[in-house]
């Protein structure tokens, strides 16, 4: 399409999510949650492209790796429980968006501007064996069987 992506890695967002206290490195959940919000806002808007989605997926995976097994003593039990799940969900959404190589409804892929009949299906994300797997499934009740 000749367009270049406006997405760039944001080192400030990523590094501000980390903190050091008493020589114990960890993730500060309130700051990391803001970083996650910024990452998703820049790539999951109405107009998207592969480059921006891949960059955001990489940043979410980096946050997810950093959050694995860590406990933020300044956050609540619920925040410590919910944040890794939010990262997993964010990864599933980004992988789903990457898998759909078309524009449909309100979401436009600048690198795939046309609607594709083969994508007239629902996206299914499954967490299995430590990874997220994306597939397409027929829409129940679709008379054309797509």
Regions found by a protein language model. Give the residues of each.
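Glycine- and aromatic-enriched mobile tails/lids
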Residues: 1-146
């Amino acid at each position: 399409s000749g367009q270049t992506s406006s997405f760039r890695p944001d080192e400030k967002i990523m590094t501000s999510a980390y903190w050091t206290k008493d020589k114990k490195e960890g993730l500060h959940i309130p700051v990391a949650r803001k970083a996650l919000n910024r990452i998703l806002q820049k790539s999951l808007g109405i107009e998207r492209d592969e480059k921006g989605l891949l960059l955001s997926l990489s940043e979410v995976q980096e946050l997810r790796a950093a959050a694995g097994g860590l406990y933020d003593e300044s956050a609540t039990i619920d925040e410590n429980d919910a944040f890794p799940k939010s990262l997993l969900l964010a990864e599933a959404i980004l992988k789903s968006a990457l898998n759909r190589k078309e524009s449909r409804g309100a979401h436009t892929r600048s690198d795939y501007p046309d609607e594709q009949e083969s994508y007239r299906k629902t996206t299914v994300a499954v967490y299995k064996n430590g990874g997220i797997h994306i597939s397409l499934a027929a829409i129940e009740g679709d008379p054309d069987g797509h």
